[in-house]
């Protein structure tokens, strides 16, 4: 388990490129036949990926020991979105078939967590966010058909995008975790611009659907002290509450956003005008 400490905004603005990447970038999300796990002190979120290829991958008691409990979800909830081939997640003996862009919410208290791919040649890629939980809500599958997409932006400002809200109060009940998927229309490059912060939540982005010769310049920092991190395909970035989180790509891309904190109201954000950015 890779542990990332919290960092003050005054400290963050003094960091060079390598230090920024070390603090906020998660480079290796998917590793064949393993789970990856990054534990952030910021709202205690855990982020990672699971890619079963030649055999199922189980998250067992070894993780619980690192968290001071018996199992990962003794005091946590888990959200998973599959961006790879078809697969399944077995939760306490019950199999949930999870296709491409299907999602599964797993509530507090689940013990057995096994991840499988249907085909080794096209493995599932289970991306997950995991957050502290105070009560148990039912495990529930969410498919793209269950999500009412919202299209925002304009081709003229190169930010036309479709937002799919998977884990939000209108779709299912969670303790604090919110997750969704945003896809840019072809020829559009900007996400979340004009940008915002949200004092009551932190956020993590996973960028994907990117070609090998493309990248995203992820914008971060306080609005008057902006920095950037160059992102490649299937990499994630941690965004503290004080930081903007926006990006511009060399080509269109898709990203998964996950938020934890004290407020699940999607529109609870502090907007920043473009002319106020520095």
UniProtKB/Swiss-Prot annotation:
Keyword check for Metal-binding: yes
Cofactor note: Binds 1 zinc ion per subunit.
Signal sequence, start to end: none
Keyword hit for Isomerase: yes
Catalytic class of the enzyme: isomerase
Family matches, as Gene3D superfamilies: Jelly Rolls, pectin degrading enzyme 5-keto 4- deoxyuronate isomerase, domain 1
Pathway: Glycan metabolism; pectin degradation; 2-dehydro-3-deoxy-D-gluconate from pectin: step 4/5
EC number: 5.3.1.17
Keywords for this protein: Isomerase, Metal-binding, Zinc
Domain of life of the native organism: Bacteria
One Gene Ontology MF term: 4-deoxy-L-threo-5-hexosulose-uronate ketol-isomerase activity
Cofactor(s), names only, from the UniProt record: Zn(2+)
Biological process according to GO: D-galacturonate catabolic process; D-glucuronate catabolic process; pectin catabolic process
Coiled coil residues, start to end: none
Pfam families in the record: KduI
Residues at which Zn(2+) binds: 196, 198, 203, 245
Catalytic reaction list: 5-dehydro-4-deoxy-D-glucuronate = 3-deoxy-D-glycero-2,5-hexodiulosonate
PANTHER family associated with the record: 4-DEOXY-L-THREO-5-HEXOSULOSE-URONATE KETOL-ISOMERASE (PTHR38461:SF1)
Family to which this protein belongs: Belongs to the KduI family.
Summary of the function given for this chain in its UniProt record: Catalyzes the isomerization of 5-dehydro-4-deoxy-D-glucuronate to 3-deoxy-D-glycero-2,5-hexodiulosonate.
Name of the protein: 4-deoxy-L-threo-5-hexosulose-uronate ketol-isomerase
Organism, as annotated: Salmonella agona (strain SL483)
């Amino acid at each position: 388990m890779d542990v990332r400490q919290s960092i003050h905004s005054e400290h963050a603005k003094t960091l060079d490129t390598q230090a920024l990447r070390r603090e906020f970038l998660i480079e290796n999300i998917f590793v064949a036949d393993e789970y990856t796990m990054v534990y952030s002190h910021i709202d205690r979120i855990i982020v990672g990926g699971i890619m079963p290829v030649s055999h199922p991958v189980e998250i067992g008691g070894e993780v619980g020991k690192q968290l001071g409990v018996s199992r990962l979800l003794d005091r946590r909830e888990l959200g998973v979105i599959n961006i790879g081939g078809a697969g399944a997640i077995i939760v306490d003996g019950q199999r949930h078939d999870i296709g491409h862009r299907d999602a599964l919410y797993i509530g507090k208290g689940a013990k057995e967590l096994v991840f499988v791919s249907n085909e080794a040649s096209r493995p599932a890629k289970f991306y997950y966010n995991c957050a502290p939980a105070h009560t148990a809500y039912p495990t529930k599958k969410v498919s793209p058909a269950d999500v009412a997409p919202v299209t925002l932006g304009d081709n003229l400002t190169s930010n036309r995008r479709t937002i799919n809200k998977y884990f939000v109060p209108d779709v299912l009940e969670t303790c604090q975790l919110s997750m969704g998927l945003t896809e840019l229309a072809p020829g559009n490059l900007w996400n979340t611009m004009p940008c915002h912060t949200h004092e009551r939540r932190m956020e993590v982005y996973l960028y994907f659907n990117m070609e090998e010769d493309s990248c995203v310049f992820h914008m971060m920092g306080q609005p008057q002290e902006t920095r950037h991190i160059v992102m490649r395909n299937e990499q994630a970035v941690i965004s503290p509450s004080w930081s903007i989180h926006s990006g511009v790509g060399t080509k269109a891309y898709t990203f998964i956003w996950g938020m934890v904190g004290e407020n699940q109201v999607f529109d609870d954000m502090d907007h920043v005008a473009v002319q106020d950015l520095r």
